[in-house]
From Swiss-Prot:
It holds the Pfam family TolB_N. This is Tol-Pal system protein TolB. It comes from Shigella flexneri. One of its GO terms (cellular component) is periplasmic space. Keywords: Cell cycle, Cell division, Periplasm, Signal. PANTHER family: PROTEIN TOLB, PROTEIN TOLB HOMOLOG.
Length: 430
């Protein structure tokens, strides 16, 4: 927890720009088919009301993953304050085999102790499966809740939790001198802050694999340019500003390279920069348009969008040479892919029958599953553990962010109150 807090501390420098008009998760479709679990409100050991609903944060995180269906608080058979008070039979009668309980205690120095216990109410009734405690200041209470969620999630699924991650996105606000803003928030929309404001459009933010930098497209020089901004100090490095289009940046998983699309020779083509030396090499060529690169885990292969066959489809190419290979065959067109960190699947924008939705493709079998049901879906970005996707869609006259689990069980919106929201990018583990 202490190391995780040190990593996250760099963001505090930017929190002077925290906004009041934040995005928040609004549930559209529940997870009745998820694993039932009990999450009890954490016991508050101080005066008045608790400063944060940690139990609510844990329940929301588990629900958002699509893998769990936390029991509504009104249906909880009991509200134990500790593992010893859990009555396994009361929970197992409701089909629940695991319960999360916890405690929040104020300290004289103004900090708080947050503790949780994950209790087995099925196979080995009363056994504590996982537990931990954290000492945090008030502004880190939500982070402590997400930490508990990560640990509970991993214990029960074997998958590393991704609830302490963040998302970057672009907001086009309703007027003002700087109507375009690149913002970052917790994955669930809380603790939002501004990274960069501009009078000109901002596009396509992409995280470095260590979470310390964002690459994005800006038009402040009068034409498109690719820049990399360090979040801790705001330092900006210009990467590319060639004639015509400069766009679609993507850091390699090993952090050594940046892929992007340029049209300096006419058609859009893919290029890769070695970030240490600044040297750029061309990966694709020809008259077709090639863009929207995303890396495979080996940092040697890219998936990308090309109109080589007429309509946009997703292809794979090795950055060291070789002919591109088409990897999407279902639907009239497929584009803007994001490959999972294990390389087993990708999500993409898939169009068929006049509909444009987010779909998931198994890269071994080629099987495709449509995940979303919103309108004109765009720019999907995977959580680092591959369980959730953030994307933008059209709603009314604007754009909003949406969340869908990669098993399709859970769907939610993250509506903003002060503008259109586009180009979401999910951070790595932080």
């Amino acid at each position: 927890m202490k190391q995780a807090l040190r990593v996250a501390f760099g963001f505090l420098i930017l929190w002077a720009s925290v906004l009041h008009a934040e995005v928040r998760i609004v549930i559209d479709s529940g997870v009745d088919s998820g694993r039932p679990i009990g999450v009890v409100p954490f016991q508050w050991a101080g005066p008045g009301a608790a400063p944060e609903d940690i139990g609510g944060i844990v329940a929301a995180d588990l629900r958002n993953s699509g893998k769990f269906n936390p029991l509504d608080r009104a249906r909880l058979p009991q509200q134990p304050g500790s593992a010893q008070e859990v009555q396994p039979a009361a929970w197992s009668a409701l089909g629940i085999d695991a319960v999360v309980v916890g405690q929040v205690t104020p300290n004289p120095d103004g900090s708080y102790n947050v503790a949780y216990q994950l209790v087995d109410t099925g196979g080995a009734p009363g056994t504590v499966l996982a537990q931990n405690s954290y000492k945090v200041n008030k502004q880190w209470l939500r982070y402590a809740g997400h930490t508990a969620s990560d640990e509970v999630f991993e214990k029960l699924t074997g998958i590393k939790g991704a609830f302490r991650t963040r998302i970057a996105y672009v907001v086009q606000t309703n007027g003002g001198q700087f109507p375009y803003e690149l913002r970052v928030s917790d994955y669930d929309g809380y603790n939002q802050f501004v990274v960069h404001r501009s009078p000109h459009p901002l596009m396509s933010p992409a995280w470095s694999p260590d979470g310390s930098k964002l690459a994005y497209v800006t038009f402040e020089s009068g034409r498109s340019a690719l820049v990399i901004q360090t979040l801790a100090n705001g330092a900006v490095r210009q990467v590319a500003s060639f004639p015509r289009h400069n766009g679609a940046p993507a850091f390699s998983p090993d952090g050594s390279k940046l892929a992007f699309a340029l049209s300096k020779t006419g058609s859009l083509n893919l290029y890769v920069m070695d970030l240490a030396s600044g040297q750029i090499r061309q990966v694709t060529d020809g008259r077709s348009n090639n863009t929207e690169p995303t890396w495979f885990p080996d940092s040697q292969n890219l998936a990308f969008t090309s109109d080589l066959a007429g309509r946009p489809q997703v292809y794979k190419v090795n950055i060291n040479g070789g002919a591109p290979q088409r990897i999407t065959w279902e639907g009239s067109q497929n584009q803007d892919a994001d490959v999972s960190s294990d390389g087993k699947f990708m999500v993409m924008v898939s169009s068929n029958g006049g509909q444009q939705h987010i779909a998931k493709q198994d890269l071994a079998t080629g099987g495709v599953q449509v995940l979303s049901s919103t309108f004109l879906d765009e720019t999907p970005s995977l959580a680092p553990n591959g369980t959730m996707v953030i994307y933008s869609s059209s709603q009314g006259m604007g754009s909003v962010l949406n969340l869908v689990s990669t098993d399709g069980r859970f769907k939610a919106r993250l509506p903003a109150t002060d503008g259109q929201v586009k180009f979401p990018a999910w951070s790595p583990y932080l």
